[in-house]
UniProtKB/Swiss-Prot annotation:
This is Tyrosine--tRNA ligase. Belongs to the class-I aminoacyl-tRNA synthetase family. TyrS type 1 subfamily. One of its GO terms (molecular function) is tyrosine-tRNA ligase activity. PANTHER family: TYROSINE--TRNA LIGASE, MITOCHONDRIAL, TYROSYL-TRNA SYNTHETASE. Keywords: Aminoacyl-tRNA synthetase, ATP-binding, Cytoplasm, Ligase, Nucleotide-binding, Protein biosynthesis, RNA-binding. The lineage of its organism: Bacteria, Pseudomonadati, Spirochaetota, Spirochaetia, Spirochaetales. Catalyzes the attachment of tyrosine to tRNA(Tyr) in a two-step reaction: tyrosine is first activated by ATP to form Tyr-AMP and then transferred to the acceptor end of tRNA(Tyr). InterPro entries: aa-tRNA-synth_Ic, Rossmann-like_a/b/a_fold, S4_RNA-bd_sf, Tyr-tRNA-ligase, Tyr-tRNA-ligase_bac-type, Tyr-tRNA-ligase_bac_1. It is an enzyme of class 6 (ligase). GO terms for cellular component: cytosol. HAMAP family: Tyr_tRNA_synth_type1 (MF_02006). GO terms for biological process: tyrosyl-tRNA aminoacylation.
Length: 409
């Protein structure tokens, strides 16, 4: 097998391929140009977008040329894959703003040389399509019967599929044809939910141009606990630090189930397989900390990752820098008078209601400093502060806040 494909396979990336042997032979013959698409349907990428981007970087490191297609045209329709309802329709101004934000995030992650990765926006060729010509030249090659066998459409037929969304596969296939013509693209990569669209695109190129092109998909990641990768109780795990703080981002990875640590180190870091195996021999917690640090470093930068690491160590290990923790300011007057612990946990955002706080205390999951809170009616005052005038409050093993008084500020 071609070394680049072998690397992806060894790390757990490959789910399906149109013809793995043929693709391997083509890659052995020399560098090829491939593409991955992302629709700008939001202001930030989330972790669910990133597995194909890790694969892109592996392929580029092996000497191949990557194209990131920003779906400024297709996003006006919305991909029905994996969706139970029609997406909100967005205008061009919003899509342009989202596209700019996404490109900035990818620039940071890829840190690339533009000779190896380039961007295109399918709005450039989709926005001015003549509908009649498109139906004759592209639509004639699609079978509705075959399209309805794809999982994305089968699921939506039960809840309602608009004709607008039904066109999405034709447009994505036309993207593959256009990129093949303009940039000699020979491979499309993406998540396994894109398999039907990718196969349809490869088939269109073969029918219209008589060329053989390829498709490669990656697994849709779920955690060992059944949770969809990148999903939290608060929603998606976004890369934008204004939506998900780097500390919370770090903690998400630090709390990876034991069974997933090796798999995620191989998929979401660029550590060698040998280094991954070596770190696992040092203990699962050491491996989890390295996973959290590496992913945070790749997404937010080394300095930010260091701060998140020190904050986590301060919260849970008794060392590190407490200043790196999420911080909430209380007035000195509040602590002089005292505040009920249930009110405190709600005020700092560790609980949504007093009932939640009482339940947390009853279950033994509330901590002020190093002390577990046992009394639902406890009052927290200045005596709870450490010598530096701060105190760490914690809900369970994952959520923590550093409290400071206004005097310190």
């Amino acid at each position: 097998m071609n070394p680049a494909l072998a690397r992806l396979q060894a790390r757990g990336f490959i789910r399906q391929c149109t013809d793995l042997s043929a693709l391997s032979a083509r890659m052995d013959a020399g560098p090829l140009t491939f593409y991955v698409g992302v629709d700008p349907t939001g202001s930030s990428l989330h972790v669910g977008h990133m597995l194909p981007m890790f694969a892109l970087k592996h392929l580029c490191d092996a000497g191949h040329r990557g194209c990131v297609l920003i779906g400024g045209g297709t996003a006006r329709i919305g991909d029905p894959s994996g969706k139970t309802s029609m997406r909100k329709m967005l205008d061009y101004a919003t899509l342009d703003a989202y596209a700019g934000a996404i490109v900035a995030q990818l620039d940071h992650f890829l840190s690339f040389d533009h000779r190896h990765v380039f961007y295109v926006n399918n709005r450039d060729w989709l926005a001015h399509l003549n509908y009649i010509d498109f139906l004759r030249e592209v639509g004639a090659h699609f079978s509705v019967n075959k399209m309805l066998t794809y999982e994305a459409y089968k699921k939506r037929l039960e809840t309602g599929l608009s004709f607008l969304e039904f066109n999405y596969q034709l447009l994505q296939s036309y993207d593959f044809l256009t990129l093949s013509d303009r940039y000699a693209v020979e491979l499309q990569i993406g998540g396994d939910d894109q398999w039907g669209n990718i196969v349809a695109g490869a088939d269109l190129v073969r029918r219209v141009r008589g060329k053989t092109v390829h498709g490669l998909t990656f697994p849709l990641i779920t955690r060992a606990d059944g949770q969809k990768m990148g999903k939290t109780e608060q929603g998606a795990l976004f890369l934008d630090p204004a939506l998900v703080s780097p500390y919370d981002f770090f903690q998400y990875w630090r709390n990876t189930p034991d069974e997933d640590v090796r798999r995620f180190l191989l998929l979401f870091t660029f550590l060698s397989v040998r280094d991954v195996e070596a770190i696992l021999t040092q203990g699962i917690n050491c491996a989890k900390e390295l996973l959290a640090y590496e992913v945070t470093r790749l997404m937010h930068g080394t300095a930010v990752a260091q701060v998140a690491l020190q904050g986590a160590r301060a919260a849970f290990g008794g060392c590190g820098d407490k200043c790196a923790l999420p911080t909430f300011e209380l007035t000195q007057c509040t602590l002089q008078v005292g505040i009920k612990v249930t009110d405190l946990f709600v005020q700092v955002g560790l609980c949504t209601t007093k009932s939640d706080a009482r339940r947390l205390i009853a279950q033994g999951g509330a901590f002020v400093g190093l002390q577990r809170v046992a009394d639902i009616g406890a009052v927290i005052d200045q005596s709870a502060l450490d010598l530096d005038g701060t105190v760490i409050v914690r809900a369970g093993k994952k959520r923590v806040v550093r409290i400071v008084t206004d005097v310190l500020e």
